[in-house]
Structure formats: structure tokens, C-alpha cells
Amino acid sequence: MMSTAAATTTHTIEARISLEDETRCQQILALWMAALNRYDATAMDALMRFPHVRLSAGKVTVYDTPGNNPMDLFDRLRQQDGWHHSAWNETKLVQSSPTKAHYAVRYTRYREDGSIIGIYDSLYVFSALDGDWRIQCRSSFGP
């Protein structure tokens, strides 16, 4: 129940991500998808902030350091579903401050013949330290 007292906020509408930083986050999302499709864990690590949190399939996984991103997920996807690549359908900034940004994203997983395996929604949380934006957390409805 909301009290009648004025609610306090952590930031104001004016205190949002700059256009330059928003562009950088969009670039990171493009680089992320390209690295994922190349099956390049090192490139993915370079775009992540550690510790990095992933919420998916009812589990919370914390990657404390680079080099711990298990690529076996993609091996399983290839074996189970014939996964070949993924693509963003939508990447939308939904909340931000000068040092944090929440992106609602939707992506599609495809087989080599172009048929669709599934379409999934996720939330990607970016954080900036000294102007260096990286993906800090991912919460996905996909496997």
C-alpha cells in the first residue's frame, strides 16, 4: 500500500542515460549477438561486467570472472533444436540513469534452414564504471 507521503525516487526523469551512452549500449548489444553467433566466449566476456548474473530456467547463475561462461548451452541447443544462430527482434531502452540502463530485448533462435526455434524475451542490465558500459545482468525467458 502506498503511503500518502511523497514517494522518494532514486533518480529523476532528467537523470537518464546520455544519447552517446545509449548508442554505445546498442553497439554492445550488436557485438554481443555477433559474438554469440560466432560461438566466441572470449568476445562475450569482453562485453560483460563481472560478477555477472544470469537468471534463466528457474536458476540464478553468477559468473565471478571471465572465462566461466559455459558454451555447452549452445552445444545442447544445437543437438536438441538444431540451433544455428540468433538475431535481435527488438532492443528497447526501458529505464536508465547516467550509470545504469535496462534494455527489454526480444530475440529469435533459428535453424540453419531459417526455420524458427523460438522467440524469447529478456532483460539486459548494463552498468557503467568510469564511462565503460558493459552487460552486468541478464534475465531471460529462454533456456
How should these model regions be labeled?
Residues 3-7, 117-143:
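Short beta-strand edge/turn micro-motifs at domain boundaries
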Residues 1-50, 55:
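Short, low-complexity N-terminal intrinsically disordered segments enriched in polar/charged residues
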Residues 63, 71, 110-113, 128, ...:
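A short local loop/turn or secondary-structure capping micro-motif enriched for an aromatic residue
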Residues 95-131:
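Exposed beta-sheet edge and beta->alpha loop/turn motif
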Residues 48-49, 107-109, 139-140:
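Short beta-strand segments enriched in hydrophobic/aromatic residues
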Residues 54-55, 103, 135-137:
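Short hydrophobic/aromatic-rich beta-strand segments that constitute the beta-sheet cores
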Residues 41-95:
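A solvent-exposed, acidic/Ser-Thr-rich amphipathic alpha-helical stretch
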Residues 28, 87-88, 120:
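Residues that act as N-cap/strand-start positions at coil-to-secondary-structure junctions
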